[in-house]
Curated annotation (Swiss-Prot):
It holds the Pfam family Glyco_hydro_42. It comes from Clostridium perfringens (strain ATCC 13124 / DSM 756 / JCM 1290 / NCIMB 6125 / NCTC 8237 / Type A). GO terms for molecular function: beta-galactosidase activity; metal ion binding. The gene is pbg. The active site is at E157, E318. It is an enzyme of class 3 (hydrolase). PANTHER family: BETA-GALACTOSIDASE GANA. This is Beta-galactosidase Pbg.
Length: 689
């Protein structure tokens, strides 16, 4: 497969660095010089600057101060560092909020916010767009030829919603365009005759509100789409200015940490306007989940971000080299975990390891957030040594830059599907757990070290051998037909209970569930039984089934009551009034097969099911050797090279028998012994010949 090349043509090294906020220390000029010394010690070669610097750059309206930034840009270049320069729109100045209150967001209760925190701005506001355009243009013109500049970082962690009059009118315009200015089309799409909610004109429509209209699911869904649309439109506004002046400088925006998968912005919509994907990675290590479980959750998001640009390496723009200050418990990373967590990103496709932030703030809300340089101000800390070790390892990985992977497996996680599931009134109000369900299916492949993409339902299915679509409640137009074509041409589809229920407007399909998936799955889903937490049913695997599975498994939370309409029954329910009904089926369709899992299950079932499926389909693993529990392997490659990352997500030393494989350690340059040892929370990176 091809090599994508480096993120910037200016630098052919793995990027290692941090968000750098020198303006916090502008009254202590000796700090800047000390920062440079420490950056060299830690093998730092890139810093992200200016993310929250609007007030420092424009202390009064129309009065600009770039001298300090000039000095920083020159200082970084002189000392061999590159700069990712941010636009400062993530946090606006106080003067703007007071002079132009329309730039402040309005909450869902229709009360305008006071000035405070960050992200407290309206993306629709013409004033806000005007003011950011001025400063973006000045930044681009001033630094377009600066040798340190390698990337634009637009704003910071886009999130949030605004319900001001400007946004409500923009929402109405969005709806007018979507429904061809025909209010009758909207009424049909939203099923407004229920409860007498029919609209006579677009002017009557208000955004969802707890004290207004929260019950029209079509309205709620279109509002979430609008939020993404308006956020993206704002991003494009900033991007257009930078691209006009610096067309050859790549542009990104940093996506939020994995909690963003439950939030209101569909990152797939940004794909056409990103030169590189970047995201902020903040795992919950050493918590209630085991570290290998947490590792699989983070792997899920890494693989999603890699898939957004079709396999192109991404950037881990932020991470903590230690603890955070906003997670419920700020548990320190155990020895080795920082290196493991950092290199896991590289294993899944990142060409950078970056931190928030370089030096701990002395005050304000993130003064206790982990950073490379602690309040002590020197290099003699455990965290600094860990960061330095990461930098040393990255300096040996130049050949890994631009490599990727071509997975045979894809798991569908779709934001619009999540919004629709979360909004549905039933079959359980709580614990629908769409993300958790998708992640559990993903984990079964991660546990086998089978490379996997995480995609949405609009992606191309044809390049995969297996597409897994858990809880595909919403099926947008054309998706059912494309899945049929995928299976017909030899692909394997796995879907589950509560799939094929509604269309893109959250209107239920008529003619039987799973709607557009009914034909390809060869089943009819008649009812869905929602169980209480303490309830349990059991599923018994049929003797002599085509997957060769055996045994009995628990069924909890959801049990779909399905009928075979041509599909092979692989397992049946063991108890309750639906005893004997199918619980797992396989339908031969064209050259491929479609599996339907009718019940929510535990890791044991998914592990056994996907292990059997992987064996049947001879799915490629990162490396074809037995790996001990707790070890995950990922692979990156191009036409010339293949690199395998062995990662130990356990607190115990592990030994791997590499058989007769010819492996060279990328860090030491030595040939790997037949018995390869990996220390607790350790990583080994090898080149395979």
């Amino acid at each position: 497969m091809k090599n994508y090349g480096p993120i910037s043509s200016k630098v052919t090294k793995m990027l290692h660095g941090a968000d750098y906020n020198p303006e916090q220390w502008i009254d202590m000029p000796n700090i800047w010089g000390e920062d440079v010394r420490l950056m060299k010690l830690s093998h730092t070669n890139v810093v992200a600057v200016g993310i929250f610097s609007w007030t420092m750059l424009e202390p009064e309206e129309g009065k600009f101060n770039f001298e300090w930034l000039d000095e920083i840009m020159d200082l970084m270049h002189k000392n061999g560092n590159y700069v990712i320069l941010a636009t400062p729109s993530g946090a606006k100045p106080i003067w703007m909020a007071h002079k132009y209150p329309e730039t402040l967001r309005v909450a869902q209760n229709r009360v305008r916010n006071l000035y405070g925190e960050r992200h407290n701005h309206c993306y629709t506001s013409p004033i806000y767009r005007e003011k950011i355009a001025i400063i973006d243009r000045l930044l681009a013109e001033r630094y377009k030829d600066h040798p340190a500049l390698i990337l634009w970082h637009i704003s910071n962690e886009f999130e949030g919603q605004c319900y001001c009059p400007l946004c409500e009118e923009a929402f109405r315009d969005f709806l007018r365009e979507k429904y061809d200015n025909d209010i009758n089309k909207l009424n049909k799409a939203w099923w407004t005759k229920f409860w007498s909610h029919t609209y006579a004109s677009f002017d009557e429509i208000e955004a969802p509100a707890p004290h207004g209209e929260p019950a029209l699911h079509g309205l709620n869904l279109d509002w979430m789409r609008f939020v993404t649309h308006q956020t993206l439109d704002y991003y494009k506004h900033e991007r257009s200015i930078l691209k006009e002046i610096t067309p050859d400088i790549p542009v990104t925006t940093n996506f939020h940490d994995y909690i963003s998968l439950f939030r209101g912005i569909d990152y797939w919509k940004f794909a056409p306007y990103l030169d590189v994907v970047s995201w902020d990675n903040y795992p919950y290590w050493h918590g209630e989940r085991t570290d290998d479980h947490e590792g699989s959750r983070i792997g899920f998001v890494h693989d999603l971000n890699r898939a957004i640009l079709n396999g192109k390496p991404f950037m881990m723009m932020e991470s903590s080299p230690s603890s955070t200050n906003w997670q419920p418990v700020a548990k320190l990373r155990r020895p080795g975990m920082h290196v493991l967590s950092s290199l896991q990103a590289v294993a899944h496709g990142s060409d950078t390891v970056q931190y928030f932030q370089w030096r701990k703030s002395r005050g304000s809300s993130e003064k206790f957030h982990g950073a490379v340089v602690d309040h002590c101000g020197h290099e003699n800390t455990r965290v600094f040594r860990d960061v330095t070790k990461v930098g040393e390892i990255l300096s040996k990985l130049d050949d890994v830059i631009g490599t990727s992977v071509e997975p045979q497996v894809a798991v569908i996680y779709d934001w619009e599907n999540y919004w629709a599931i979360n909004d549905a009134q039933g079959p359980r109000i709580e614990q629908k757990d769409y993300f958790e369900t998708c992640q559990k299916h993903y984990k079964a492949f991660w546990d086998m070290s089978i490379p996997t993409d995480v995609i949405n339902m609009d992606c191309d299915f044809s390049k995969y051998k297996v597409v897994v679509a858990p809880m595909l409640y919403m099926v947008r137009p054309g998706v059912g037909e494309r899945l049929e074509e995928f299976v017909k041409n030899g692909g394997t589809l796995v879907t589950t209970y509560w799939s094929g229920i509604v269309d893109e407007n959250d209107l239920c399909f008529l003619g039987g569930f799973p709607g557009p998936l009914k034909k390809v799955t060869g089943i009819w889903a008649e009812e869905l039984d929602a169980l209480y937490d303490e309830d349990v049913n059991y599923v018994s695997v049929e003797e002599g089934n085509s997957l060769g599975m055996k045994g009995e498994y628990e069924a909890r939370i959801f049990c779909d009551l399905i009928h075979s309409e041509g599909a092979e029954v692989l397992a049946t329910y063991k108890t309750d009034f639906y005893k004997g009904m199918p619980a797992l089926t396989c339908n031969n369709f064209g050259e491929g097969q479609a599996y339907y899992i009718a019940f929510r299950n535990n890791d044991e079932f998914l592990s056994d099911f996907y292990s059997s499926l992987a064996k049947k389909l001879t799915l490629k693993r990162a490396i074809e050797i037995d790996l001990p529990k707790g070890i995950n392997a990922q692979v990156r490659m191009d036409e010339k090279n293949e690199f395998v990352f062995f990662m130990n997500f356990s607190s115990e030393e592990k030994t791997i028998d590499i058989k007769d494989l010819d492996l060279t350690d990328m860090v030491t340059g030595e040939k790997v012994a037949k018995e390869m040892e990996i220390e607790p929370y350790g990583v080994r990176i090898v080149r395979r010949k």
